[in-house]
């Protein structure tokens, strides 16, 4: 009986990805004076540029000092972006690393002949995060995860009239387009 209980516990904690808590990626203290939301699509080249050029500077200058809370939020523009965002939710505490790879290889995995090929490309990437083929399929077909990703887009449209990516919202004020760090710094420093 003891062996059965131990085996059950091992299977419970190692066999499947946990979908109980769907979280996104954030930096800084959530009670900071400045709240910056980044609405992005994982197939958007300007979002990739923002991710590599501007976001690290914002994290270093503000979020790392708890002056700003940065939320990376989903605004998928197409099915490949939707599916990539769903898989992001399944890599748990490695989402930042996942986004690095997704954005670096964006032109390879996203530019496929069809959605099945996109999904196969995403499956190959997900193996780097320990996601098995069956867990990948479960993640991709999980309705709660899909609802979470799509609700982020709906909220962005409803609350901020977001219609393109990347869109930055600083304390509920919207800024669209690929803004550079120096441009955002002007807006941010006025709020400090």
Q: Where in this protein do the model-derived segments appear?
A:
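Cysteine-centric redox/oxidoreductase cores and disulfide-bonded domains
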Residues: 76-164, 169-182, 186-192
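Extracytoplasmic thiol/disulfide redox context detector
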Residues: 2-82, 123, 127, 145-160, ...
């Amino acid at each position: 009986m003891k062996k059965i209980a131990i085996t059950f516990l091992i299977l419970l904690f190692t066999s499947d990805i946990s979908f109980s808590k769907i979280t996104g990626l954030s930096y800084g203290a959530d009670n900071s004076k400045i709240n910056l939301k980044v609405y992005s699509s994982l197939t958007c080249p300007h979002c990739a540029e923002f991710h590599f050029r501007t976001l690290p500077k914002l994290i270093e200058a503000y979020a790392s000092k708890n002056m700003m809370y940065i939320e990376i939020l989903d605004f998928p523009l197409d099915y490949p972006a939707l599916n990539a965002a769903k898989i992001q939710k399944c890599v748990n505490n490695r989402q930042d690393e996942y986004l690095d790879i997704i954005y670096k290889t964006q032109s390879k995995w996203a530019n496929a002949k069809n959605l099945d090929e996109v999904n196969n490309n995403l499956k190959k990437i997900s193996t780097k995060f320990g996601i098995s083929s069956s867990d990948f399929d479960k993640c991709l077909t999980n309705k709660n995860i899909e609802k979470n990703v799509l609700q982020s887009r709906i909220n962005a449209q409803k609350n901020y009239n977001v219609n393109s990516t990347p869109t930055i919202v600083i304390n509920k004020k919207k800024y669209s387009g690929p803004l550079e760090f120096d441009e955002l710094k002007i807006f941010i420093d006025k709020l400090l």
